[in-house]
Design a protein with these regions (language model features):
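Generic protein-terminus/edge-of-domain signal
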Residues: 1-61, 65-67
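A hydrophobic/aromatic-rich effector-binding and dimerization subdomain
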Residues: 16, 20, 86-150
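A cytosolic small-molecule/anion-sensing beta-strand core signal
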Residues: 54, 70, 79
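Short beta-strand His + acidic residue motifs that chelate non-heme Fe in jelly-roll/DSBH
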Residues: 59-61, 83-90
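Short acidic-glycine-tyrosine-enriched beta hairpin
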Residues: 64-76
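Histidine-centered metal-chelating micro-motifs
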Residues: 75, 79-85, 105-106
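An amphipathic alpha-helical interaction segment
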Residues: 133-175
Length: 175
């Protein structure tokens, strides 16, 4: 039986793909910059995660079902969910996303409202299909968070990051 990796930190995810960690509780992901390319792994998420998949690179198994996604779709995962991923060998990864730890949103409006985002539900195994305009909005939200992560952590960091994540999630609800 394959070992299940406990994904309880942003750094753990970044280690898996050879990406840099800028903040201990949140990370903006660009898999085209990955330096490691695992082809088969099972993750037990301890984080929230949203990924805009720009290529169908293999299968994602969510429970006993295959996650329904294609190019240009958003997949989402929440703490406690176990996901098996099989990446087709030789496929260049192309996905953008965000990972954030539940501790980041404690005491924020996002923390109070996180359960309203139904796409994080374990029962959901369908990806959100985006139009070109919606993809631009998704990527723009990630860019704002990424810019904030490039600054040293200060008294405003948590508020600005969590509000921008909340904006991204609200857009995903609209889509």
């Amino acid at each position: 039986m394959e070992k299940i990796l406990k994904l309880d930190t942003v750094d753990r995810y970044n280690e898996l793909f050879g990406l840099e960690t800028l903040h201990p509780l949140v990370g903006v992901v660009d898999l085209s910059k990955a330096t490691k390319f695992p082809t088969h792994f099972t993750l037990n998420y301890g984080l929230y995660a949203l990924f805009l998949k720009e290529t169908k690179c293999g299968d994602i198994r969510y429970g006993k079902q295959i996650y329904d996604y294609q190019e240009g779709t958003v997949t989402s995962f929440a703490p406690g969910q176990v996901v098996e991923t099989e990446i087709t060998d030789g496929i260049k990864l192309s996905a953008h996303g965000i990972l954030f730890h539940p501790d980041l949103i404690k005491g924020t409006s996002l923390g109070k409202n996180i359960k309203q985002y139904s796409f994080f539900s374990y029962a959901s195994n369908e990806a959100l299909h985006l139009s070109e305009e919606e993809k631009e909005i998704f990527l723009d939200c990630l860019k704002k968070i990424s810019i904030e992560l490039s600054h040293p952590i200060d008294n405003y960091s948590k508020c600005l990051i969590s509000k921008n994540i909340e904006l991204l999630l609200d857009y995903c609800m609209r889509f």
